[in-house]
Amino acid sequence: MTSYKIPQLLKQKTWEWLQNHSMGHRFDANGSKEEQFVGLLGENMFRIINDLPAKFEDGFDGGHDLMFMGQKADVKTMGRNVDPQPHYVNNFVGYQQHFDCELYIFCSINKRTDTFWICGYTDKQTLLTQSTFFEKGQKRYRDDGTYFINKAPLYEIENSKLNKLSI
């Protein structure tokens, strides 16, 4: 896994943009402002690392964020209070499985240290077959004993099952 420091200016611009816009375009489980902030910040960090401009646009993106390695890719970012570990999981909302996307790039943001981590990537078929699936409403426990209730059908894949990405 590779880490990068998040520029304060990008954080500020992302938060300000989200005050008047929403990234949620599904019929359910669109994420809170904080979750949308983490997602957009992660997507734009990945874009910048790959010498692409940051993107702040309204409307549905068609299910993918960018072209990467010749495929339609979606950047999925989780906010955490710690650095990611190989056994930590990445979440994929089941409502998105029919979107036009071929590749998923999983990232994490340590909110306490403003560090962006690229955890790895996988293709859609591998994600759907190698993940653990949980129904909406199921209780999910974390390493520290805390839990959350799934707001949507959820696939979880461990960082250790992802392909490594060197940029």
PLM features: residue spans?
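Nucleic-acid endonuclease domains
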Residues: 1-69, 76-167
